[in-house]
């Protein structure tokens, strides 16, 4: 295939601006699927993507398009996620392409994630074509959005394409712009094979499947290939492309995107961003690869049935292959048994992984409250990274604690600016910058990550009636006043209920948790004391009263000492029961007790 006729492009946008719908129309226009096979969000293969109306995994498809000049072009389309938690998927997709369609909702205008994604495309040296979607709606304002693109993003929007992905208006113009305005891939067919590993997933029959982009040379069936980071060698069994159906081909050459299978069983051999080359004729230098992504939110996941531990381990391994951005390690809890401490890119990422575990692997799970990574510096100068309250250590040995901060970009209509700034200030935020484009404010704030990851996104959407948008990136660590809050039930610490809290909120948090546990734990035959403590200091307490049996009911008249004797006997029995009895805490109590209330 002549690389001059290949175009590799990604579709990038803020969440809900119509990326997946535009992808559907492009596939339809190029006859990628027959009419009877077409459905909404055709590239969103997971049920959870369809139900939530979001893209989670970047997807690829090859289309054939006969342009007005009579030439046949091969278009490799990458549909990318729009939510901030999945921005890593966007970065990987952009590395495989030369150009991007920047889709902007012409009724909403530029939003925070639009900015973040377009800057990633600019960093990847992409040619960018602005596409203004939803022009058939009465509230559409293309001229205003064009000026926003030029003012806020700084790219020329005079040749923006006006489309309605839902009704199909302007789709041919998009295809013509792709072939005329986006560059063909560079690279040399005669050079040794050099391909970048873009994604991996697990297939029950084929083992590990690799999605790759060929940069130089050619990859053929039967060829011996090498993963340059691990030096692992495999023989290629199958080569294919997505149309969007899987289609087996003989080879992939310069500029092409497709998948290979090679009976790979070792997960560690397939690192996202690795360079693949031919064993007999290796390329000189590997590709720079992708930036290593680190989880920022951690929580523990436990199977409700002890016998499901191994099934959970296998499920996590398979999901990690398809999503290298989340991590897991074994954890043992005295309250919940054996489970895993898992790391995620954000709260939506956590919810999606937990939901996939329960749906795809039929597991019944309990997840503890999420937390972030703190840096603890001991008095002898040793730095430890801690995301689990159990690893906090002795307070006496700690010199200082640092917590992660982020830089948030918030775009909000000016009538909601006051309430949004008030929320940021309540979350210990520091204002960095405020600018305007028309009646839209562009707000930059520095905030502690622990205040943002839980419900900040939902709160921003709620107080702005859905009009505000948020994007954020890590901005280093800062010294902070942090304390470990321990919850005791009948003087016994419960590890699953421990959490790390800022000292300004520790008393309020302790009282909240104790009050919730009082409602959640069923009454027993003896008194239950629920306490919140920081170190050895008790800062909050609630008591669950026992059931009371009237042991004196059978008495009538007689000596008062008989009555006292029976009550004393009951008291001794309850004391003995409390000493040997375990308080049964329901599974859902752990999550409900740790939920944040403002």
Curated annotation (Swiss-Prot):
Catalytic activity, EC: 3.6.5.n1
Superkingdom of source: Bacteria
Protein family (similarity comment): Belongs to the TRAFAC class translation factor GTPase superfamily. Classic translation factor GTPase family. LepA subfamily.
Keywords: Cell inner membrane, Cell membrane, GTP-binding, Hydrolase, Membrane, Nucleotide-binding, Protein biosynthesis
HAMAP family xref list: LepA
InterPro entries per UniProt: EF-4, EFG_II, EFG_III/V, EFG_V-like, EFTu-like_2, G_TR_CS, LepA_C_sf, LepA_CTD
Sequence ranges assigned to domain tr-type G in this UniProt record: 4-186
Name of this chain's protein: Elongation factor 4
Top enzyme class: hydrolase
Gene assigned in the entry: lepA
Stated role: Required for accurate and efficient protein synthesis under certain stress conditions. May act as a fidelity factor of the translation reaction, by catalyzing a one-codon backward translocation of tRNAs on improperly translocated ribosomes. Back-translocation proceeds from a post-translocation (POST) complex to a pre-translocation (PRE) complex, thus giving elongation factor G a second chance to translocate the tRNAs correctly. Binds to ribosomes in a GTP-dependent manner.
Catalyzed chemical reaction(s): GTP + H2O = GDP + phosphate + H(+)
SUPFAM superfamilies reported for this sequence: EF-G C-terminal domain-like, P-loop containing nucleoside triphosphate hydrolases
CDD domains reported for this sequence: EF4_II, EF4_III, LepA, lepA_C
NCBIfam families: lepA, small_GTP
Keyword Glycoprotein: no
Primary location class: membrane
Keyword field contains Membrane: yes
GO cellular component, one term: plasma membrane
GO molecular function, one term: translation elongation factor activity
Positions bound to GTP: 16-21, 133-136
Subcellular location: Cell inner membrane
GO terms for biological process, alphabetical: positive regulation of translation
Segments passing through the bilayer: none
Source organism of the structure: Ehrlichia ruminantium (strain Gardel)
Bilayer disposition of the protein: Peripheral membrane protein
